[in-house]
Design a protein with these regions (language model features):
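Short acidic, hydrophobic short linear motifs in intrinsically disordered regions
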Residues: 360-362
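Helicase motor core with emphasis on the C-terminal RecA-like subdomain
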Residues: 2-11, 15-19, 23-45, 52-55, ...
Length: 362
């Protein structure tokens, strides 16, 4: 079996591992089921890509979004990894299945709804599986900020192939969510690797709202380079994008109300740009591979501390200085308290704690 460091240097061109990457990789290669909670920008994908290249068989990567899978596929293929996606929009599914069964894939990306189906289990019986990597693993927990019920259906697949190590990965999970991920995915409590959350290159700031458009425009003017501005509504996103266009910077909008082709074009333009501002709802950002984002602004309160950490963590992934600025108003907290009334009774206590954390001056 090739040494992980040799793979890192020859395939990826990095001189050495960062943070807890090697700890995670060595556990996975020893067959230990693991949950890795690592900061945004810490290189979580290497934690399954390196074992996938070292171990016999194919690594199955469960990922929540088709766009995210296709971004990861392009990045993997760019360094020569044999990878494929198996999604509803792929027209080459028969070819991908043939590549899997003939042992010609290092990585196979699938959505949780496909991975949990009986047909997929039968496919995996036809060739060796090296590893299950469950990306964005907080989606398995009702306590997480982005719960996806399909993630709850993965356990039978994992248990069917109980001899195959499983690696769950997330950047955002509080203690309650971590415990739930471990329980839902059958990972022992001593399988947790918790890296630090500090992002020292990001300068965090908060300001009371007093004319949001001007405040954000001033931030844009003061901060060269690409940036993301999170807005709480679709209409607000379009309105702010129009207003910021007057700054002279290229500005695009991104929200679920736009035509999918427009969303995709705007995302591609942002990823390729050196100075674009993206005004977006929280629909934008998961898996965006853009290391040079120089600022992330919030024109209102995010829905939780975890969501705030994940969204601001899209800034400065290249390690250079970046800014995260939150513009808040008392009405944000009023709306958040109103939303508590829509939460299931067994989750109200936890959501109150989250809201209190957002309101805390520390």
């Amino acid at each position: 079996v090739p040494h992980p460091l040799a793979i890192l240097q020859t395939v990826f061109g990095f001189p050495g591992f960062r943070g807890r990457q090697l700890d995670v990789i060595e556990r996975v290669m020893a067959g230990v089921n693991t949950l890795a909670v690592m900061p945004t920008g810490a290189g979580k994908s290497l934690c399954y890509q390196v074992p996938a290249l070292a171990l016999p068989g194919t690594c199955i990567v469960v990922s929540p979004l088709i766009a995210l899978m296709h971004d990861q596929l392009r990045a993997a293929e760019a360094v020569g990894i044999r990878a494929a996606t198996l999604t509803s929009v792929d027209t080459n599914r028969a070819e991908t299945i043939e590549r899997y069964t003939s042992g010609a894939l290092d990585l196979l990306y699938v959505a949780p709804e496909r991975a949990s189906g009986s047909g997929f289990r039968e496919l995996l019986d036809r060739a060796p599986v090296a590893l299950f990597a469950i990306d964005e693993a907080h989606c398995v927990s009702e306590w997480g900020h982005d719960f996806r019920p399909d993630y709850r259906l993965l356990r039978p697949l994992l248990d069917r192939f109980g001899h195959v190590p499983r690696l769950a990965l997330t950047a955002t999970a509080d203690a309650h969510t971590r415990a739930d991920i471990l329980a839902q995915l059958g990972i022992p409590h001593d399988g947790l690797i918790l890296a630090g959350f500090d992002r020292p290159n990001i300068r965090y700031a908060m300001s009371p709202r007093s004319g949001t458009t001007k405040q954000v425009a001033d931030l844009v003017a003061a901060t060269p380079g690409p940036g993301i501005v999170y807005v709480q509504s679709r209409a607000g996103t379009d309105k702010l994008a129009d207003a910021l266009s007057a700054t002279g910077r290229p500005v695009r909008a991104y929200h679920a109300g736009l035509d999918p082709a427009v969303r995709a074009a705007n995302q591609s333009a942002f990823v390729a740009s050196e100075d674009m501002v993206m005004c977006a709802t929280i629909a934008f950002g998961m898996g965006i591979d853009k290391p040079d984002v120089r600022f992330v602004a919030h024109a209102g309160l995010p829905k939780s501390i975890e969501a705030y950490y994940q969204e601001t963590g899209r800034a400065g992934r290249d390690g250079d200085p970046a800014v995260a600025h939150l513009f808040w108003g008392a009405d944000d907290f009023a709306r958040a308290r109103q939303r508590l009334g829509e939460v299931a009774e067994d989750r109200i206590a936890g959501e109150r704690v989250r809201l209190a954390a957002l309101a805390s001056p520390g």
